[in-house]
Every structure is written in C-alpha cells, then in structure tokens.
Amino acid sequence: FSIIETAEELQRNDEPSPTRSAVLVRRSNSHIRIGTFQRLKYFKEYDNIALLLNHLSENYFTNIKSKKSLKILAENIFLESVKRIAESMGRIVIAGFVHGVLNTDNFNVTGEVFDYGPWRFIEFANTSYTAAYFDNNGRYSFGRQPEAALWALTQLGKSLDEFIEENIIIETLNQFSKSFHESLKKHFCWRMGIQDI
C-alpha cells in the first residue's frame, strides 16, 4: 500500500475542489467483491455464481473443496468470508482506521476491504467520527464499521440464497460478532505488546 502525491490540483464534482491529487497503489488477494455476487444474483446468473464459487475454492479458499455438493461449497465459502471480514474489521478498528465508504463493492469475499475513498486515521477514540464529508448520517462512521460489514455480508448471504438455506445464512451471520470480538481482542493485545488474555 502506498500513496504517491502528484503536483496537480484535482477538480471533482462530488468533493470540495480543488484538492491535492495522488495515486493510490494497493495490492489485494483478489478483486472478487460482494457486489460481484449481487450483480450475478440480480441478473439470475446462477451458473456464473456456481463458476465463481468453484473459482474461489480453487484459487482463494484452497482449504475448501466440495466436488459433490455446490450447496456445501457455498456454505463453507460464505462462512469463511464472514470470518475473514470479521478479522479485517478487528484490525481496522484497533488501528483507528475509518474507511469512509464501506459498501458491497469495497469488500472482497476473501476478507479485504479496499477503495478507501475519503479514509482517515482517528487521533482519539470517537465512534461517531466520519471520514466522508457527505456522510451526514454517520452510516460509515468509525463506530458503525462492523455494522456496515455485517450488512454487506447479509447482502452476500442473500446473493447465495439459491445455494444456501435461509437458516444456515442466519446461523453463519450470527458468527460475525464472535469472530469480530476475537479479532479485536487479538489485535488489541498485539498492539499493547501483551500475551493474549
């Protein structure tokens, strides 16, 4: 991850201008977003969802294999996505990072968040702090980031409902809170330089 500032002034219609401009360089394990599944679901491209699930299994979730059942594959990938995104949220919160716009196009199913938009690091704990000037309701505020992640994962569950039963989707989503709090504890202890408590 790096930011290279240019000498140019940037004019934008959706943000105060002119502003300083920069190029953001980032690396991600994948660019398969929750929004990718939403689009396929919207157009009822269930065969393509199946292909994408198999692609994820072969390339990004190599510990998850199920040649016999697409249903089991979908359930396991969904569960792993919930755990990985909960882990990312724990790291983000402990670092004091405010993403700015946590929507389904900014979550990879492999657990990373990206396309940070108007991101910031907070100087002191403030759950209502927002990085985006347009976020008047605090939808993407520092304290609501885990809620935004759970909402995005709910959309992923809805996108996979042809393959996963509703009760399994709900049970899987219910694991987010536990995984998130485990991540918070782990990263807090690491940051403080103490053994896990």
Q: What positions do the PLM features span?
A:
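Conserved ATP-binding subdomain of kinase catalytic cores across diverse folds
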Residues: 1-69, 110-112, 152-153
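Catalytic activation segment of kinase domains across protein kinase-like and atypical kinase folds
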Residues: 18-21, 94-99, 103-152, 158-162
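Alpha-helix capping and helix-loop boundary segments enriched in small/acidic/polar residues
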Residues: 43-47, 69-72, 76-79, 116, ...
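Glycine- and acidic
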Residues: 63-75, 134-142, 166, 170
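Regulatory N- and C-terminal appendages and interdomain linkers associated
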Residues: 137-197
